């Protein structure tokens, strides 16, 4: 059995890890932490887990977690995971960070967008945790930086096109996210009266996920990619629908675009390329680790419109983290994740 610890178990991504791992046959959770609920049973904090776990929350105790676990998930604010990772790696414990500490190729980008105290990247064998692109690197890594939710939806939709030089590098992205993407902590903007029957844009052209997108899309393209990103919060609990507007380099039809996607993802269980004319919906991936991809060619303007749908808490966070864990420990990649989406 793989012995697992979770730092930050009472945030949305932490409790989603526990939900998904409850059916993982090769995992046992040995340690969970919460600064807000230390000493309480996880089932008292989240009654949805009643009967699945008999474990109480600790305060953040790195030495204790490392002594009991083979791998730890960190779902903490920026800067914390790097400190935990250094101690864990010394003891041979693997780390999967659901925050931003290990997403970037260079520390300066992280510092510019996230700030805070940070131990840096030196001496840590790490990988960017998008399995469909970096599976081999993930397998060899001690620390994996789980991608952000928006970048996951965007990168999966665009990498095949950029690698095959189908589109140019000036891309406009419009993303709609469920309220859970704003996190567990309450704020006036996220209460029911503010969110219900309302969609609002936020951090347009200045969202912290932009440099992550640019980094990965530029690597796929082989040249610098320019991204204009407009995120929105919508009155639903889960899900991200990203719509990407790209200029075609040549006059390709629907069937040719489909073949580019189908060939790239032919061996990827969690990415489903929809047939031409079918568009993705967040409802059809709800509660699952799947990404659905659709597209449309606007012949009048030479624009390719790409659409992706994911569950922001699963493929956009905790499910993808478990997928990375499975790869790191060389077990079936679908373990704990082979779940039919919830419908309706």
From Swiss-Prot:
Predominant subcellular localization, coarse grouping: cytoplasm
GO BP of this protein: L-arginine biosynthetic process
Organism: Caldanaerobacter subterraneus subsp. tengcongensis (strain DSM 15242 / JCM 11007 / NBRC 100824 / MB4) (Thermoanaerobacter tengcongensis)
Pfam annotation, one family: Semialdhyde_dh
Pathway: Amino-acid biosynthesis; L-arginine biosynthesis; N(2)-acetyl-L-ornithine from L-glutamate: step 3/4
Gene that this polypeptide is encoded by: argC
Enzyme class of the recorded protein, top EC level: oxidoreductase
Protein name: N-acetyl-gamma-glutamyl-phosphate reductase
Alphabetized GO MF terms: N-acetyl-gamma-glutamyl-phosphate reductase activity; NAD binding; NADP+ binding
């Amino acid at each position: 059995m793989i012995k697992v610890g979770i730092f930050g178990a009472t945030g949305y991504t932490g409790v989603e890890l526990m939900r998904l791992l409850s059916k993982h046959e090769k995992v046992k959770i040995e340690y969970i932490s919460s600064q807000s609920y230390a000493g309480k049973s996880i089932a008292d904090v989240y009654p949805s887990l009643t009967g699945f776990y008999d474990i109480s929350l600790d305060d953040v105790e790195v030495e204790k977690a490392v002594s009991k676990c083979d791998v730890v998930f960190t779902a903490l604010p920026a800067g914390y995971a790097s400190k935990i990772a250094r101690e864990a790696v010394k003891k041979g414990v693997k780390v999967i960070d659901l925050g931003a500490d290990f997403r970037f190729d260079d520390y300066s980008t992280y510092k510019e967008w996230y700030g805070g105290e940070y131990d840096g990247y030196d001496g840590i064998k790490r990988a960017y945790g998008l399995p469909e692109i970096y599976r081999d690197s993930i397998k060899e890594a001690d620390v994996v930086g789980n991608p952000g939710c928006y970048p996951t939806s965007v990168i999966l939709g665009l990498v095949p096109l950029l690698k095959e030089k189908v589109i140019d590098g000036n891309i406009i992205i419009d993303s709609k996210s469920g309220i859970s993407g704003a996190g567990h902590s309450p704020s006036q903007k996220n209460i029911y009266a503010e969110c219900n029957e309302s969609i609002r844009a936020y951090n347009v052209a200045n969202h912290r996920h932009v440099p992550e997108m640019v980094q990965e899309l530029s690597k796929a393209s082989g040249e610098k990619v320019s991204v204009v990103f407009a995120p929105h919060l919508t009155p639903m609990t889960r899900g991200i629908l990203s719509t990407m507007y790209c200029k075609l380099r040549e006059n390709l039809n629907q069937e040719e675009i489909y073949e580019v996607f189908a060939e790239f993802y032919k061996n990827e269980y969690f990415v489903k390329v929809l047939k031409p004319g079918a568009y993705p919906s967040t409802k059809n991936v709800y509660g699952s680790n799947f990404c659905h991809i659709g597209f449309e060619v606007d012949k009048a303007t030479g624009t390719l419109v790409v659409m992706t749908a994911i569950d922001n808490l699963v493929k956009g966070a905790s499910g993808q983290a478990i997928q990375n864990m499975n790869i790191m420990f060389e077990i079936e990649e679908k373990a704990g994740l082979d779940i039919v989406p919830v419908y309706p």
